[in-house]
Curated annotation (Swiss-Prot):
The gene is FTRV. InterPro entries: Elect_transpt_acc-like_dom_sf (IPR008990), Fd_thioredoxin_Rdtase_alpha (IPR004207), FTRV (IPR044166). This is Ferredoxin-thioredoxin reductase, variable chain, chloroplastic. GO terms for molecular function: oxidoreductase activity. One of its GO terms (cellular component) is chloroplast. The modification Phosphoserine is found at S70, S71. Residues 69-81 have a biased composition (Low complexity). Pfam families: FeThRed_A. It is found in: Plastid, Chloroplast. Keywords: Chloroplast, Oxidoreductase, Phosphoprotein, Plastid, Transit peptide. Belongs to the ferredoxin thioredoxin reductase alpha subunit family. It comes from Spinacia oleracea.
């Protein structure tokens, strides 16, 4: 579909908008005027005419698709394989559990601290499993979001969030 843009005076633009609305009877068009601007909208296009002191400006608005094509994308009618559902359920049950890391890890992106080392004696809480997002299975490198609270000298308690693999932590008593 090709769309052209024409530059015209504000009076001509308003009369052309009403003529376009009358000429295309099969496409419902709506014309509204508010605060020195006229808007012509249809199911196929949306044009906004703005009047200024020197000239009229014609802007083309894009429409957003509300439904995806049924031949592509995620089909909600088909069910996922049972082993994926069991794995998802098993991983979602871990959310809220207290965990410890198995070996020391360095965390670099902590505000106002150069680096923090997580040791096996520190306890964190799993906040989220990110392997299932917006109805689709994804394969993140570090699927578990774990929150730690550490005491830093001269700053008090600092909350930091770390993404970990399942092999990097062990679950302790809930």
């Amino acid at each position: 579909m090709t769309t052209g843009v024409a530059v015209m005076s504000s009076a001509t633009a308003a009369s052309t908008a009403t003529a376009t609305a009358a000429a295309t009877a099969r496409i419902p068009l709506f014309l509204s005027r508010n605060n020195s601007s006229a808007t012509v909208c249809s199911t196929l296009r949306c044009r906004t005419i703005t009047r200024t002191r020197t000239r009229a400006r014609l802007a083309i608005c894009c429409e957003v698709a509300l439904k995806s094509d049924s031949s592509t994308g995620f089909d909600s009618s088909s069910s996922s394989p049972p082993e994926e559902d069991e794995e998802l359920k098993k991983n979602l049950e871990k959310v809220g559990c207290k965990v410890k890391v198995k070996s020391p890890l360095k965390v670099y992106h902590v505000p106002k601290l150069p680096e923090v080392e997580l040791t096996p004696d520190m306890v964190g809480v799993i906040k989220q499993y990110v392997g299932f997002w917006k109805g689709k299975y994804i394969s993140p490198n570090y699927p578990f979001k774990v929150e730690y609270r550490i005491d830093v000298p001269d700053r008090g308690s600092v909350k930091l969030v770390v993404h970990l693999k399942e092999e990097e932590f062990e679950i302790i008593a809930e």
